[in-house]
């Protein structure tokens, strides 16, 4: 586990979308990837608990794969390839519904976990967490782990 995932310090990456945009631009300038790397954000919500468990990205190909397979399939902006959620961890998700926002520039996927959590981090009991397991203190900007 990295320092970023366990830290109580707030270290937000406000350049993430800039990096993603540059990656898309560079890929297109180089002749394009097998599939267009243009992406939009996807909020992923647990159908049963209503928790937002992840915010990630999809491109058109990943979205269509998700819809066809009824599974959570995303686009990895760090690896620039399809991300079959749970392919290595076994933490897969059934895709139950999909919604688009008013400007049609982001999606909401309603999913049901097939086993448990979604995040690569684990709590003290060894169970996978959801990605939003740290709460920000408004005064100090310190993080508190709500699922230690």
Question: Each PLM stretch: what is its role?
Answer:
Residues 2-39, 46-148:
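C-terminal binding/interaction regions
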């Amino acid at each position: 586990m990295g320092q970023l995932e366990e830290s109580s310090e707030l270290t937000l990456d406000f350049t993430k979308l800039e990096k993603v945009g540059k990656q898309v631009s560079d890929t297109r300038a180089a002749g394009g990837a097998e599939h267009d790397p243009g992406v939009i954000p996807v909020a992923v919500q647990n159908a049963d608990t209503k928790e937002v468990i992840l915010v990630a990205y999809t491109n058109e190909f990943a979205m269509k794969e998700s819809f066809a397979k009824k599974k959570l399939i995303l686009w990895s902006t760090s690896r620039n390839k399809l991300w079959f959620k749970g392919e290595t961890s076994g933490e897969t998700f059934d895709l139950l519904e999909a919604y688009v926002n008013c400007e049609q520039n982001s999606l909401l996927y309603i999913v049901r976990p097939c086993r448990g959590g979604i995040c690569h981090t684990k709590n003290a009991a060894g169970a996978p967490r959801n990605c939003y397991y740290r709460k920000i203190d408004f005064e100090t900007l310190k993080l508190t782990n709500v699922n230690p």
